[in-house]
């Protein structure tokens, strides 16, 4: 789960990470009120969306007067901000963060990620923070400072000092940076984070170290014990189909292809997507109906897939163990009767009660394409998709 910048900063501040003063606003008038309460004469008005690269997309505006603050908020609120990380559809801006724009001398980068290959937390830092860090990481990986954390002991002070010195800081700045690095790690660890990015981490003229921006993501599987974080969820920033799927205990992730997938089991779902790609097609989604899928759940899965207007064909691939092929077949028939399926439907069933499932489909009178193997099913789905486009 992702959170907004201001929410990430509230969490970081609670762990002792220094952040600029700021306040969230949902209207231009609230933005002006926030600026007056914060004081000063220079503010940043930041669009709050679950994506980075806002600066290059015009999502961060610097203001020197209250009128400029009002105009900036009015320009951002209610719009869809398109950045390099949002895709062409963008993300809706329903709130802005008004922050004191303190002058600074240097921009650094600090990040924490779960390195799944190493099975460790990896701390990443760089002297070259700011908007171009992605390009720097891709073209000049040697510019990144990387430290792997041993989970039995956690991030150590000597590792934080090593990072701080490699960032080229003076003695006074090193002390502040070490505190920031250690406290940010505690926030990442204690909140079940999967990603924390502070970009930029700035150094001011008086040697303070501030988190000028922050992005945090959290492990969905741990939210049951992090209710304060779960309550930060903003459904407007996600795919509404994913939220609907979660309500029915379905795992759904929308993609940009044209072949909808309804599969049981995450591994089989990924294999199905791979086979579609291998056959020359593009999957429109990842959808795992899980074990023990009832006819109602399968019908819901169809409604989710068909809500994507890009879908030109649907591939149902079920290997029934805990599940039952006859239940899935009943769900397919139920969906066809309740939802207009106007795209080719390819079905491959195997496992428990497969003969009963095939019989239900055969007697349903549905216009569908059957397959006995995954390779055959993927090939037929791609052929049907291409035929539907012509």
UniProtKB/Swiss-Prot annotation:
Catalysed transformations (reactions): (S)-malate + ATP + CoA = (S)-malyl-CoA + ADP + phosphate
Swiss-Prot/TrEMBL GO biological process terms: succinyl-CoA metabolic process; tricarboxylic acid cycle
Co-factor binding comment: Binds 1 Mg(2+) ion per subunit.
Keywords: ATP-binding, Ligase, Magnesium, Metal-binding, Nucleotide-binding, Tricarboxylic acid cycle
Catalytic EC class: ligase
Pathway: One-carbon metabolism; formaldehyde assimilation via serine pathway
ATP-grasp domain residues: 9-244
Known partners and oligomeric status: Heterotetramer of two alpha and two beta subunits.
Family: Belongs to the succinate/malate CoA ligase beta subunit family.
This protein's name: Malate--CoA ligase subunit beta
Protein's gene: mtkA
